[in-house]
Amino acid sequence: MKKIASAVLACTMAASLAGCTITSPETVGSIGDTTFSAGSYLLAQYSAVNQLMDLVDDSSATVKQALKTDVTTDEGETMPGSEFVAQKTLENLEYSAGLDAALTARSIQLTDDQLSQIDSLTQQTMQNYGDLYAENGIGEKTVREAYRRNLAYTTLFSAVYGDDGEQPISDSDKTAWLNENAVAGDVLVLPLTNPDDTDHEVTDDDKDAVKALAQEAADKVNGGESLDDIADDTLSAAFKVVGMDYDSESDLAANRNSVVIMPSELSYYGSDFENAVKDLEVGKTAVIERGNTLWVFSRRPASEVKDLSELEANYDLARLIKGEDFTQELTDAGAAMENHLDQSAMNAYKAGKVKLSK
């Protein structure tokens, strides 16, 4: 519930200009030309608290407990949870001010279709999470403004880094980034269990035999042989060990594939896989255990595994390459503006009162 309910908040760095169910104080001051309502501040704070809870080791900790706990940020800095929330709340507001200024400077306006999309998303969100947001002082106008900023950011980003933007990212730069940051390669998946017959016992000796087959395959590929050339025989032998029937055409197609994994996707594959591929050089092959399977993974440059056009159809490469830096640039721009936030007004809204679930 916590992560779902905060999705609209996190994607916009949590800021808005209007709308709040709490009336005193009505605003908390301004950064640059952006004035923040109480609702916008509470939204920024709510997002910051959610970020804090993701860093706390104890998943059962309450917000008040988390605020008193030391946490380590993604940058490796250790600080009290309360300090982290205050810092992130301010950064969220600075980002919003920086974004507003950049939109004004480029005279960016949302289209009618985008405005209709904002209305639809706002209505859906309020139907699903309106009660929770209301308990946190976040009203419909605030949520609407959050979606407006999200779409405005997308439009601004395209104006800067899109194909027709101010600083378009070349295909060569995209390819270089993929080869440096994505994990890509050829995969042969060998079974360690028999999912077709749960009554069939796969012994430890059987698993060791499959592991030996996997290592033999990896050694052959490292020795210069092609994974495609040895895949059929290796997979057939592994199926036989675990008592599975093998069809060369269908089973080979299902278990021999190629992957390109973006940095943000690595955690999905598990820590064992992430640690194994981290130091695996391009051109080398290793055996990696994943659940009830073994991967014979041969690492290759991403540009050799899939065409750039195919990857662009599935990923917003420009956002992957420049999105984080661009967001930080907007935050830094906001931080450099005149800050007229009212600390006493902000102190009226305690982070310890944030509710994460209804």
Predicted features and spans:
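Hydrophobic/aromatic residues in well-formed alpha-helices
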Residues: 41, 115-118, 143, 174, ...
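Peptidyl-prolyl cis-trans isomerase
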Residues: 216-270
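Sec/Tat-exported extracytoplasmic proteins
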Residues: 45-48, 52, 93, 97-110, ...
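N-terminal targeting/tethering segments
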Residues: 22-138
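C-terminal motif of bacterial Sec signal peptides marking the signal peptidase cleavage site
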Residues: 15-19
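PPIase-associated folding chaperone regions across multiple families
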Residues: 133-209, 215, 266-358
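Positively charged n-region of N-terminal signal peptides that target proteins for export
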Residues: 1-10
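Cross-family detector of peptidyl-prolyl cis-trans isomerase
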Residues: 22-23, 32-39, 216, 230-235, ...
